[in-house]
Amino acid sequence: MSNTIKMVVGLGNPGKEYEQTRHNAGFWFLDELAWKWKASFKEEKKFFGEVARATLPDGDVWLLKPTTFMNRSGQAVAALAQFYKIKPEEILVVHDELDIPCGRIKFKLGGGNGGHNGLKDIQAKLGTADYYRLRLGIGHPGDRNLVVGYVLNKPSTEHRRQIDDAVAKSLQAIPDILAGKCEEATRFLHSK
């Protein structure tokens, strides 16, 4: 049996100044997944990002951290997907989510972009919203005028711990997600 998911994308912004910001929660997840799978990232200019190939029992899975900045993430996702003939429904995008309390997780196929610029660009470049999303809750600052500053700043120690716990829990669901057991993964991820 082959993997249902052939590419896992972590969203974030490149550069040291953004490494520890909330908007990079997708990168944090991908770094942990690569470590778990013993896969190493290397810069791939033709894919506009850092790419790692994980060789798993049921087939290869590509890991991608776009280096295009968040609002152009679709350029990297589309380039890798087209080159390796990966369909949108074989892609899992992991990203920060303002509309979910800090430390909570949501998993789904398709849907809107919720104002997330990375998702907007991915949808535009793929021509569809029918890809999987793993949404890591970072909480909301309470005022939409504070959103940009909020996502581009470091979380408090307590919030970082909650996000790290969400990343750890999400990693436990990856085998089910890869195997196409999405109901099981959803039940596990959505539980407290």
From Swiss-Prot:
Binding residue positions for tRNA: Y18, F69, N71, N117
UniProt-annotated catalytic positions: H23 (proton acceptor)
Family: Belongs to the PTH family.
UniProt keyword Hydrolase present: yes
Chief location of this protein within or outside the cell: cytoplasm
Listed name of the protein: Peptidyl-tRNA hydrolase
Database matches in InterPro entries: Pept_tRNA_hydro, Pept_tRNA_hydro_CS, Pept_tRNA_hydro_sf
Enzyme Commission number(s): 3.1.1.29
Subunit-structure text: Monomer.
GO BP terms in the entry: protein quality control for misfolded or incompletely synthesized proteins; rescue of stalled ribosome
Keywords: Cytoplasm, Hydrolase, RNA-binding, tRNA-binding
Subcellular location: Cytoplasm
Matching CDD domains: PTH
Site description Stabilizes the basic form of H active site to accept a proton, residues in chain: D96
HAMAP family xref list: Pept_tRNA_hydro_bact (MF_00083)
Residues at the site labelled Discriminates between blocked and unblocked aminoacyl-tRNA: N13
Functional note: Hydrolyzes ribosome-free peptidyl-tRNAs (with 1 or more amino acids incorporated), which drop off the ribosome during protein synthesis, or as a result of ribosome stalling. Catalyzes the release of premature peptidyl moieties from peptidyl-tRNA molecules trapped in stalled 50S ribosomal subunits, and thus maintains levels of free tRNAs and 50S ribosomes.
Any one GO CC term of the record: cytoplasm
Annotated gene: pth
Domain of life: Bacteria
Catalytic activity: an N-acyl-L-alpha-aminoacyl-tRNA + H2O = an N-acyl-L-amino acid + a tRNA + H(+)
Pfam families: Pept_tRNA_hydro
Source organism of the structure: Neisseria meningitidis serogroup A / serotype 4A (strain DSM 15465 / Z2491)
Alphabetized GO MF terms: peptidyl-tRNA hydrolase activity; tRNA binding
